[in-house]
Every structure is written in structure tokens, then in C-alpha cells.
Amino acid sequence: MKGYSIDKFPEKHARSRIREEDISVKDAVNIAHFLRGKKLESAKDILDNVMAKKTAIPYFRYLDSISHRKGIGPGRYPVKESKVFKKLLDDVSANAEFKGLSENLVIVSLSVSKGRMIKKFTPKAYGRAGAFFKDLVNLEVVVVEEE
């Protein structure tokens, strides 16, 4: 992961990035899809409600055996991933405050990509070992001041 996923940044923007976090790629993709385009403060409130298990994140991808929630369809409460996204949004909020941007910030880009893969082994019977792979996740966000 060299740079950001967008090439041209808007005039008044703030950005932040978290690299190689140990969270689920599938849950992170669904959270990013849900929060993209929302206001920054409203996105933080949504993540607080997800961590309190009051609001579910609607899933649009990776829907195998995902239970339906009342009013939104298939969804879950990914608490661990929500904590990481909350940290990311707090970081970009601090960056925007440092740049002197106002409080009216909108998330224009929120992307998730796979990071480094860690190869691990689990012991099996008869002295064998089975490999399993752990994907790490890169997150990045760009917010713009709304007029």
C-alpha cells in the first residue's frame, strides 16, 4: 500500500490511515460501505450505537448465513471492527481540527484493502501441522468540509 486510493484530493480536506490492523476484512468492507457519504459526527454516533449493540450494520456483501435485522435486512454488530473505525474517525477529526476545518465534515472516501498476510500453523494429530492464514487490513478515510 503506497498511497491513498484516490488520486486528486479536494481543496479543503483531511485524511487519515490505519495500516495492518487485525480485524475481519469482510466486516470492514460492509462498515465502510455503510459509512461512506455520511457526516463525520453522525458516523461516530452510528459506531457508538453498534458498539452498544443498538444499531446493526446492514450487510450488502458476504451474506452467507447472515441473520436479518428488523427494518434493515441482513446485518450484524461488528464491535471489534467498529472500535477500529471509531479510532480512524477520531484521527481524521483531529487532523481536520489541526487544519482549521469547520465541524461540517463529510466522508467522501472510506476504503478498505487487504494488508500483509501472516502465515500461522495449528498442530494436528500424528505430528502434523495445518497452515492457516491471517489477513491484516488497511483502512483509509478522506473527509471534506461541507459548505
Which residues does each predicted region cover?
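Generic structural "secondary-structure junction" signal
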Residues: 25, 59, 120-123, 134
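Glycine-centered flexibility motif
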Residues: 66-68, 115, 127
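Eukaryotic intrinsically disordered and solvent-exposed regulatory patches
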Residues: 92, 126-127
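Extended, charged amphipathic interaction segments
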Residues: 102-125
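C-terminal edge-of-domain segments
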Residues: 127-147
